[in-house]
Amino acid sequence: MPEIKLTSEELKYMSLFQDITGVTARDCIIDDRNNRIILLINPESMGVAIGKNGLNVRKLEKLINKSVEIVGYQENLEDLVKNLMSPARVKTIKVVQSNSKKTVYITVEPQDKGIAIGKNGRNVERAKLILKRYLDIDSVVVV
């Protein structure tokens, strides 16, 4: 796993998240292209972090004027990918390496393909950002 360095802006968002939710974020990724921040937390804290009816997330979004996405972090690739693609149902995950580039092929239920990809590919982009940061994976393909 590559060493993760956090910027002062990422640390600021993580601190704000903890103040609002009481949950410690493991990591924060700022995605300016989609005007959002992605927070990785321990999966068992997901309910507390989101808050009743999404109250904590909405409060944070209002404060920072960005969309907030929370992902349950897992050490192994398979569980992490399932969390990243949720609520889409993942059938198989295959890693292919060619010319020093790693690609993850994620097969989902046919009716869940749109959910897995997301509007304008934002869910695939989120998966790519996180998998690149933690597992040095270069691209993500949903099939």
Swiss-Prot record:
SMART domains: KH (SM00322)
GO CC annotations, alphabetized: cytosol
InterPro entries: KH_dom, KH_dom-like_a/b, KH_dom_type_2, KH_sf_prok-type, NusA_arc, NusA_bac
Keywords on record: Cytoplasm, RNA-binding, Transcription, Transcription regulation, Transcription termination
Transmembrane portions of the chain: none
Domain annotation KH: ranges: 34-100
Superkingdom, natural source: Archaea
Gene Ontology MF terms: RNA binding
Localization (cell): Cytoplasm
One GO-annotated biological process of the protein: DNA-templated transcription termination
Family recorded in the similarity comment: Belongs to the NusA family.
Family matches, as NCBIfam families: nusA_arch (TIGR01952)
Function of the protein: Participates in transcription termination.
Designated name of the protein: Probable transcription termination protein NusA
Organism: Sulfolobus acidocaldarius (strain ATCC 33909 / DSM 639 / JCM 8929 / NBRC 15157 / NCIMB 11770)
